Swiss-Prot record:
Transmembrane spans: none
Upper lineage: Bacteria, Pseudomonadati, Pseudomonadota, Gammaproteobacteria, Pseudomonadales
Pfam families recorded: NifQ (PF04891)
Protein task: Probably involved in molybdenum processing.
Entries under InterPro entries matching the protein: NifQ
GO molecular function: molybdenum ion binding
Protein name: Protein NifQ
Domain of life, source organism: Bacteria
GO biological process: nitrogen fixation
Gene: nifQ
Family under the similarity heading: Belongs to the NifQ family.
Organism: Azotobacter vinelandii
Keyword Phosphoprotein: no
């Protein structure tokens, strides 16, 4: 887990790399291990998928468990795993939404959909809940993996708000009371700067 780009925090341009997802996954795993994301130890993946991801990208971490990170990190990870399990239906809806918009040519998109869906359940901006360095990095990651969904965010809505709005519109319901985003008194909550 030691590429120069990831150490510089430069995964925004990773899409040019032959293995773009590797750099993003490296950042996500490192952030989770350092307690800088909302993700549980398995990143929202089932044990088999997680083991495959680690074996494929980070074999040096193959024997690591959440318990090996220390008692506090282990406890936090277990709590995050429990919270994810309580919201499994919501996670699945988000995962399906992402997969419906996937590029379709990379099996790693399955992993990324599960990870992004798990991070959507966190309480901060999505890029922070994933442990990424910026909203722009998240945008590039989403455009790379889920372009058919990400390109619909033409008004630059915050990603979590955008995903949940897409789910509401799919089901024929609307969370918002305003007839349009432009007339909404909470416009800044959905479209304001993420700092």
């Amino acid at each position: 887990m030691g590429s120069a780009a990831a150490h510089r925090g430069d995964t925004t341009q990773a899409v040019r790399h032959d293995r773009a997802n590797h750099l993003w996954l490296e950042r996500i795993v490192r952030s989770q291990r350092d307690g800088l994301s909302c993700l549980p130890f398995h990143l929202g993946l089932d044990e088999r998928s997680y083991a495959e991801l680690i074996r494929t990208h980070f074999p040096e971490l193959a024997g690591q468990t959440s318990a090996s990170l220390g008692s506090l990190a282990h406890e936090c990870s277990e709590l995050r795993e429990d919270l994810l399990e309580m919201r499994r239906d919501e996670w699945e809806e988000l995962r399906v939404l992402l997969l419906d918009g996937r590029r379709g040519d990379d099996p790693e998109e399955l992993w990324m959909a599960s990870i992004v869906a798990a991070a959507c359940l966190g309480g901060d901006h999505l890029w922070r809940d994933l442990g990424l360095e910026s909203r722009e990095t998240l945008r590039v990651l989403l455009m790379h993996n889920f372009p058919h969904l990400a390109e619909r965010n033409v008004k630059n809505m915050r990603w979590k708000k955008f995903f949940y709005k897409q789910l509401c519109e799919q089901d024929g319901g609307y969370v918002c009371r305003s007839p349009s985003c432009e007339q909404c008194p909470s416009h800044h909550d959905c479209f304001g700067a993420e700092i």
